[in-house]
């Protein structure tokens, strides 16, 4: 009987020692794992500072014969600006542009200070633009009346406005004065008269106004 009790006690002691060994092994395996996990977790990086949004530019132009269009496209190429063509609701024909005929459409419009030729181009939102180039041919010493229509339709207050024109001989000074009168709250800069898209003064004028792509 004593031998049986001793045997049972020996077995219980053996099982107890085995259980302790298992627990000890488990603890030794899990603790380094937690330490390794903490070591591998990279520190959080500070949030990036928001960058200033680049100024948006728009080139607006009216071109009766294609000369002003070529200059407008060159300015767009040099600056990366968006391009918008002012298209008359009623296109101008060759007869409309026959300045030798006092009754031609262009002459009649320029002789009427209140003339407001309709624009057929799709309306656009200019509010997001900081700088607006405005191009046109010179008619009767100033800009065509359809440019007045554009200025009546869109508020350029607070924007930088850069007029440019194409002309064989007439200057741009009067049209710049007219734009300043129409947009008194805009920063209307001195304009550029270009002979064509290859005119080297285009790039110089853009640079002089502190504009780059």
What positions do the PLM features span?
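C-terminal motif of bacterial Sec signal peptides marking the signal peptidase cleavage site
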Residues: 16-19
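Glycine-rich phosphate/pyrophosphate-binding loop and the adjoining helix
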Residues: 187-213
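Short, conserved loop/helix-junction motifs that constitute active-site signature segments
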Residues: 126-127, 152-158, 182-183
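Short, surface-exposed alpha-helical segments at coil->helix boundaries
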Residues: 69, 73, 144, 172-177, ...
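Positively charged n-region of N-terminal signal peptides that target proteins for export
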Residues: 1-4
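Sec-dependent N-terminal signal peptides
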Residues: 6-13
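N-terminal beta1-alpha1-beta2 submodule of the flavodoxin-like/Rossmannoid cofactor-binding fold
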Residues: 21-130, 141-143, 152, 203, ...
């Amino acid at each position: 009987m004593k031998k049986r009790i001793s045997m049972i006690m020996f077995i219980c002691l053996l099982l107890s020692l085995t259980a302790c060994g298992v627990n000890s092994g488990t603890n030794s395996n899990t603790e380094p794992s937690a330490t390794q996990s903490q070591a591998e977790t990279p520190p959080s990086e500070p949030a990036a500072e928001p960058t200033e949004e680049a100024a948006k530019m728009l080139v607006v132009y009216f071109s009766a014969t294609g000369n002003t269009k070529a200059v407008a496209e060159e300015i767009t190429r040099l600056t990366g600006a968006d391009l918008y063509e002012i298209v008359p609701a009623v296109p101008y024909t060759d007869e409309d542009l026959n300045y030798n005929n006092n009754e031609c459409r262009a002459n009649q419009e320029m002789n009427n200070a209140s003339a407001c030729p309709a624009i057929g181009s799709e309306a656009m939102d200019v509010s997001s633009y900081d700088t607006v180039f405005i191009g046109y041919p010179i008619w009767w010493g100033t800009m065509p009346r359809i440019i007045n229509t554009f200025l009546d339709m869109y508020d350029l207050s607070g924007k930088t406005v850069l007029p440019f024109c194409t002309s064989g001989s007439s200057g741009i000074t009067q049209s710049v004065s007219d734009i300043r009168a129409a947009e008194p709250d805009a920063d209307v800069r001195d304009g550029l008269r270009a002979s064509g898209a290859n005119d080297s003064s285009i790039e110089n004028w853009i640079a002089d106004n502190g504009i780059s792509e």
